[in-house]
Structures are given as C-alpha cells and as structure tokens.
Amino acid sequence: MPDHTPDADPAEARLALLRLVACGGPAAPRRRLLEHIPDPRAAIADAAACRDCGLSSAQLGALRGPAPDTLRHARDWLQAPRHHLIGWHDPDYPPLLRRSPAPPLALFVAGDPALLWHPAVAVVGSRAPTPGGRDNAAAFARALVGSGLAVASGLAAGIDTAAHAATLAAGGHTVAVLGTGPDIAYPRGNRELHARIATAGALVSEHLPGTGPRKEHFPSRNRILAGIALGTLVIEAAERSGALITARLAAESGREVFALPGSIHNPLARGCHRLIRDGAALVENAQQVTEALAPVAEALAGALRRRLAAPIAGDGEHGAPARVAPERAAQAQRLGATRDDADYQRLWNALGFDPTGMDELVQRSRLTTAQVSSMLLLMELEGRVAAHHGRYTRSR
C-alpha cells in the first residue's frame, strides 16, 4: 500500500489543499479523497484515488493544469499572522460542522481558529430590524456571552451587526461566517466591524481570499453558520428570510432552533411565529437558550479538553494547526448539566458495532429523529459513538 504519511513541508501541503479547493465542483468527492489520503499533496497526485473517490473529469483537469492566479493571492493571504486554512483532513476542523450535512472542504479563518471549537449560538435575523429587534439582539448576545457561550452570525447589516457588536463590547467571543472571501468586508459599512472581529474573534469563509459577494454564496454561508453552532436563535424575520434558511439548516443538522415571539402587527415577527408553529422553541430570555443547550455544550467542552491534550504541529500561525486555548474549555464547562439517562440508554441499546443508519436507530429506540440526531452528536463528541458516512457505531 502506498505511504501517504503527511510531508513535513506545510507550505506545499497548503498549496495542494488550495488546489483542491480551487478545482470547484461537488465537495463530497474531495472530502472522500482526503479521508482516503489525508495528505493533500499525495491525494491530488494519485489519479486513481481521485477517480475512485468520484472526482469529475473537470476537477481532475483543474488539478493537473497550471495553478490558477487566484491561488497566488490565497498563498499571500495565508502568510499573514492569524490567517489559517483548515482542511477536512485536519484535526482542528470544527467538530460540530463535521457532523452537519454537506460540510465544506476547507475553511479560511482570520483570527482565532480555536473559537470554531467553542460552544456557540448563531444569532440571526432581519437586515432591516425594528429598534426593538436590534435591542433584543444586543441584549441576548450580552447574556449569552455572560453564560460562557460564543455568538456566531453572518456579518450582515441589522441583527447580525447588532449581535457581533454587542458581543465584542461585552468582551465576548464572536465568529462571523462570510459569503465572501475572508479578506472582503461586506457590506462595506461593516469594514470596521470586520477588522475588529479579525482581531478579537474569528472571520470564517469557505471561499478563496479575494472572492467578492455573489448571491449564490450566501445560502452556503448560512449552512456553515448553522453547522458551527449548538443552536440558532432567530430574533426577527419576515416570512421569506435568509434567517429562516439558517434555522431550517440548523434543524436538519439536529441542532436546536429558538425564536423570539413578537407583535402580530409586526411583519418581522411573522417568520419567528412560523418557526414556533413548526416546532422551534419560544424563548423570552437567554437562560432558556443556555438551559436547552447545556448537555451538548458540556460534551463539546470535553472535546475541547481532549483537543488540548493532543499533540499538534506548528504554532498556529501562517496556516499551521492551532491549539485551542485553555480558557475556552474552562468557559464551556460552566454550561454543564445533566441529561435524561433513560433516553440515552435506549439509544445506546439501539446502537451496535455494525454501522446503523439514522432511520433504523429512530425505529429501534422509538425516539424522534431530532432527539436521536442531537444525542448522537453529544455521544460522538464524548467519544462513545463513531460516524461512518451517515451511519453510526459504538466506539467502545
């Protein structure tokens, strides 16, 4: 069997990963390739493995051809301090995002990549909120920070901006998921906030540096936002809103969805009311959010502690792997709580050492799909369950 031990030259490995990102097309075959060969240089050089993993002829042609000019800008961007590239094969890839549907092949991060492991709530809503909606976004963000959670949002105008700004003002941790490259501030009015988050938080994008705003990128931005968070809180939203897309994606990932009720006369309350009718939790204060998320947050804190103990290469700068900070795990521990052991035992009994799909686990355990998905996430973070392409086994 060929030796695919990762090469010692991180710059060449990063270039190979950049080429894999830039070749475009469906991400799933490229993820399979990195699962099969976790060294990007060896992966893209193995034509047979590329074909076996499902890469298209167009993708193969892009990998074999000359490196596009866009990669030069990306390589230059990665040379700056606190600029990182985290691939699917990387142990620093965010564990919650890994468990979401259709995760991205790689993430560009400006700022602190350890924040992608920190328990977070996505706070989303209208780009043109009411004054009350803006105030609620800021108040909930401050309270979530006080409970030890990070606040994630999309750096859009309105609710996103209010949540990010209030988090920074409270001395908390915030993650901004972008629909552009990590170096592009959009909207332009948020250039200062973009710079502040790069310094005190984390900017995250699946797009190459230099990529400008494109309409088709923002739904995928919402997918990542829903995927890195323990749950999604919708402050204000019209019936047709990007915030509702984020909420739907969160539910599909087995995450909690929360919504604030509002006046029946406020058009921006209708989206929240629709979510509540569809099963989202109605919340009136941040404590209700933290109580609902406490079990999974504690499991994520355990994953943080294990990651702290793991050996790493590099110092976290210039694209090298980054160790999560000890205070992240300490803050996450504040969210610990007990869980319903009877339901977990039912799911554990339904699991075996042969890979089992979600539908069969729901049938065996007689729990709901949402319950099983959430419990599997927690058990996987604890190291009790292993996931194999949508099927699950006991790991011990």
What are these regions (language model features)?
Residues 1-102:
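N-terminal positively charged helical leader segments and presequences
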Residues 2-12, 76-396:
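Glycine-biased, small-residue-rich flexible motifs in mid-sequence functional cores and linkers
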